[in-house]
């Protein structure tokens, strides 16, 4: 709600008329007891009558000396009430509401005395509901609104200074108020925060400047803090001209409210009003008296009394709450957790929001509540990170398994390729083993580089005939039969080196070796023989010079003959 709704304005001409009274602290305590003992506001009922135009001419002051006919005359408003049963009681109630203020002041003095003794006339808890559904008081169905006096030129001044008042509203309020739920610091609109903001949801209108909502303890504390000394850390960029304008605005509002109190006390009661009308007019006139007395007290406190230690403690609390948030943001930036201080202030992370609320909390109850929220949010975020890491580990494990399968298949494919390459190399080795020469490779005669023309002996090509297989020649027999016959022809197992090549794989021919297995075994036989050392060397040297199997066979026959001659 609008904070300036607690203050009535008055003309600056009438400044000297109202003597300023020095209110004691007991009056303030009694006022707060009255507020706390008042009826709770109710939700969901009609409060459209609050927006009606309040139209009372300036001739109110001499009206107390006029005739009874002028007092009984009702002032009509543009918004007509269509309920038919109320017309007779309107004029009486509007005039008698003025005469009740003196009697109500006496009642409130009795309430103050009762509150000092520890009793209250109606100790009901206050309940501040949603600001869109809150209404002032509980009206019976056949009662109508009473009129309040307002000055048209003051309305104009209020409309002109609306921007200044909005800046003044934002200036002095902390983010959270004692005994209230913490305000959300996410920058949402003030129209949707369940009645916790300190200003009205609509823009300023001159029609509803005097609308008063039953103040709850939260609003009372808020207005008390508003009138205390304000910390300089809240508005650093406020210029000196704005401060002077705001102070002048507060002075004018407090002086106008004291003038209105004088005007209300001058009206003399003509007679006791009926009970049903008194029940309707009592809460609203209570607002008038409470509001004027309250503003007088605040004005006197602002002008005459020095700041109390309570003012200093609340200001220090606000300063420490703001400085603690700034220090936390700077520490996070210096540690590298946040990039900038602005990022921490605008962060929407749950743990960050709870941390900011905990630093700004007013008491230990809110601090523990926000601490629990921060711990739960941190635990939830850690659980989410653990789940993300688990999913990542599962994905990595699946990728590793797939890569293992790929590696296994690739190694098998590589083995196949290696075997094919070795087979191709072995065929190339067979072709180029003797340099393409068909004759004896030991013949080292140089062939001439220039060939003269001569007769070439043309070899006749014989066509293959199946009858050739019956012939004795090996060249016309099929490969399978030829292999079997060659195996059968082998008699000496020591000399089967070339025949074994038919069964061996192609890759085994490329295995590097200094000497063949057959030559090695024959060399061992010669070395273990009882021949002399010179003869052994001669036989081994002749073995290495052999090119065909027949030569090896001849050398070994000679060796056997020598051994037989020695043994015999």
From Swiss-Prot:
Residues 387-416 form a coiled coil. Residues 190-208, 294-305, 441-450 have a biased composition (Polar residues). Residues 344-411 are annotated as: Multimerization. InterPro entries: Paramyxo_PProtein_C, PProtein_oligomer_dom1, RNA_pol_Pprot-P_XD_paramyxovir. Residues 33-41 are annotated as: N0 binding. Residues 412-445 are annotated as: L protein binding. Residues 7-24, 56-105, 132-144, 151-167, 239-253 have a biased composition (Basic and acidic residues). GO terms for molecular function: RNA binding; RNA-directed RNA polymerase activity. GO terms for biological process: DNA-templated transcription; viral genome replication. Gene3D superfamilies: 1.10.287.340, DNA helicase RuvA subunit, C-terminal domain (1.10.8.10), Viral phosphoprotein oligmorisation site domain (1.10.287.320). The keyword Secreted does not apply. Keywords: Coiled coil, Phosphoprotein, Viral RNA replication. Residues 1-24, 45-324, 434-455 are annotated as: Disordered. Belongs to the respirovirus P protein family. Homotetramer. Interacts (via multimerization domain) with polymerase L; this interaction forms the polymerase complex. Interacts (via N-terminus) with N0; this interaction allows P to chaperon N0 before encapsidation and form the N-P complex. Interacts (via C-terminus) with N-RNA template; this interaction positions the polymerase on the template. Essential cofactor of the RNA polymerase L that plays a central role in the transcription and replication by forming the polymerase complex with RNA polymerase L and recruiting L to the genomic N-RNA template for RNA synthesis. Also plays a central role in the encapsidation of nascent RNA chains by forming the encapsidation complex with the nucleocapsid protein N (N-P complex). Acts as a chaperone for newly synthesized free N protein, so-called N0, allowing encapsidation of nascent RNA chains during replication. The N-terminus consists of a long intrinsically disordered tail. The central part contains the coiled-coil multimerization domain (PMD). Forms a four-stranded coiled coil structure. The C-terminus constitutes the alpha-helical domain that binds to the nucleocapsid (N-RNA complex). This is Phosphoprotein. It comes from Human parainfluenza 1 virus (strain C35) (HPIV-1).
